[in-house]
Amino acid sequence: MMARNIQAPATSSMGRLFDAMAFWCGFDGVAGCEGHAAMMLESWAAAVSGEEMPGEPYEWVMHEEGGLLELDWRPMLKAVDDDLLRGVSRGCIARKFHESLVNLAFDVAERFSLDRLVLGGGCFQNAFLLEGLAGMAQSRRCQLSLPQRVPCNDGGISLGQAAAVVRQWKG
């Protein structure tokens, strides 16, 4: 089905990456609710202290072409696979994954000389991720903005998309 692109749409959703990472780390596939796999990944990450985490957070590769920035997660997945083969615990892998996302957000902000990150999407309901972003924002003197009047999850994504289009139109 995937080879023929049947019921296998392309996606850029960070939520799907959280799901994939949770399954890769051993989530059993029985989801009791939307986001269940991602919530398990968050709980595994939160159960591990920074001192227990072997090595650095995973690396992402950024490619810019034609004014678009592509975030290549393949090197990160290779490193996760290496950790799994070495027997690194799923909690440590989950923590390194979360910390890599925090680093990625600020690497992108730095690349574009941004002093504010506007967060939206269901993955920002993840307290562990938000705490990491808040800590890094303070040390980097960067402001974080979260939705106040619209939901942070998928219900609010369209507003962010509309704002991006308006900004693009205004130049």
Go through the PLM ranges and name each one.
Residues 1-116, 128-138:
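A contiguous, well-structured pocket-lining segment that forms one wall/lid of small-molecule binding clefts
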Residues 14, 84, 121, 148-149:
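Fold-independent oxyanion-binding glycine-rich loops
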Residues 24-28, 124-125, 149-151, 164:
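Short, glycine-/Ser/Thr-/acidic-enriched flexible segments
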Residues 105, 122, 159:
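Hydrophobic, well-ordered secondary-structure elements that form the walls
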Residues 108-115, 120, 136-143, 162-169:
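Hydrophobic alpha-helical segments
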Residues 118-120, 127, 133-157:
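Conserved phosphate-binding/catalytic loops in two-lobed NTP-binding clefts
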Residues 98-99, 145-171:
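Glycine-rich phosphate-binding/hydrolytic loop that grips phosphoryl groups
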